[in-house]
Amino acid sequence: MKLAITIILVMLSVCYSSDTCPGFLQVLEYLFMGSESTYEAALKFYNPGSDLQNSGMQLKKLVDTLPEKTRVNIVKLSEIILTSNLCNQDPSF
């Protein structure tokens, strides 16, 4: 569970910009709300190689153990962060 939360936070730290793949938010939505097969297909689109594909599927299995409300809220939070004008600024936490 700690690993899943850590990976989620790392993914959320990527801000939406011209350097960020437009499909990133869609892949996140499949991770949190899609079926395993839908998420797997989204990963395969990017040709990650078998080790990365397997790691992504392990992450999906961990994420699927979270309550649905938590997963929905993580997607909403991701959308807010990735589409925020603040993403263009250097965060000083």
Curated annotation (Swiss-Prot):
Listed Pfam families: Uteroglobin
Molecular function per GO: phospholipase A2 inhibitor activity
CDD domains to which the protein is assigned, alphabetical: Secretoglobin
Secretion signal span: 1-17
Subunit structure: Antiparallel homodimer; disulfide-linked. Interaction with LMBR1L is controversial.
Name of the protein this chain belongs to: Uteroglobin
Gene source species: Neotomodon alstoni
Keywords on record: Disulfide bond, Phospholipase A2 inhibitor, Secreted, Signal
Similarity field: Belongs to the secretoglobin family.
Record-level GO cellular component terms: cytoplasm; extracellular space
Chief localization: secreted
Purpose of the protein: Binds phosphatidylcholine, phosphatidylinositol, polychlorinated biphenyls (PCB) and weakly progesterone, potent inhibitor of phospholipase A2.
